[in-house]
Structures are given as C-alpha cells and as structure tokens.
Amino acid sequence: MAKKSMIARDVKRKKMAERYAAKRAALMAAFNAADDPMDRLEIHRKIQALPRNSAPSRIRNRCWATGKPRGYYRDFGLCRNQLRERAHKGELPGVVKSSW
C-alpha cells in the first residue's frame, strides 16, 4: 500500500491538471503557431508561469486498489500484484491463466 500522502498528492495534481488543461492547450497552440522568436519567447514564459503541478506529465498512474505506482497495467488500472490476485479469484472477466 502506498503512502496516503503520495496518493493525495497525485489526486491534487490530477485536479490541477484538469483545471489548467484548457489554458495550457491554448498557450501550446499559440506557441506552435507563432513564427516570430520573440512571440514564442513571450508565450513560453506564460507557459512557465503556470503551476508546475498543472502539467499532465507530472501525474503518476496508480493502482486503484493499493495506490502503488509501479507495475501498473493500464487496461485494468491495477498493479501487477492485484491483477494476479484478482485474476486467480475470477474477478476480472475475460482474463484466463495461459497454458500451452
């Protein structure tokens, strides 16, 4: 189980990224469309002025059952340990143990 403070920090980052997503996307579109280097520099400064935690790259994928950040499977939203446990119990429809 991950520390509750780390899980809370990640939730805070998700909310902040959602809040600033439109503004960040507009600035990035303007940055990519700008031809003048001075305009690009000004827009870049505005992007840098946004809160650091509003960047989507700072959000960490976490297991919804345990909060673990490592060994995360996107298809299920679970870490590898929980995926194995729940697959053995039959709680994941369509997941079967492979044999050949």
UniProtKB/Swiss-Prot annotation:
Which SUPFAM superfamilies does this chain map to? Answer: Glucocorticoid receptor-like (DNA-binding domain)
Carries keyword Cell division? no
GO CC annotations?
A: cytoplasm; small ribosomal subunit
Q: Which UniProt keywords apply?
A: Ribonucleoprotein, Ribosomal protein, RNA-binding, rRNA-binding
Entry GO MF terms: rRNA binding; structural constituent of ribosome
> InterPro entries annotated for this entry?
Ribosomal_uS14 (IPR001209), Ribosomal_uS14_bac/plastid (IPR023036), Ribosomal_uS14_CS (IPR018271)
What's a BP term from Gene Ontology annotated to this protein? translation
PROSITE patterns, per the entry: RIBOSOMAL_S14
Q: List the disulfide bonds.
A: none
The answer to whether UniProt assigns keyword Transport to this entry is no
Listed name of the protein: Small ribosomal subunit protein uS14
- Quote the gene name from the UniProt entry: rpsN
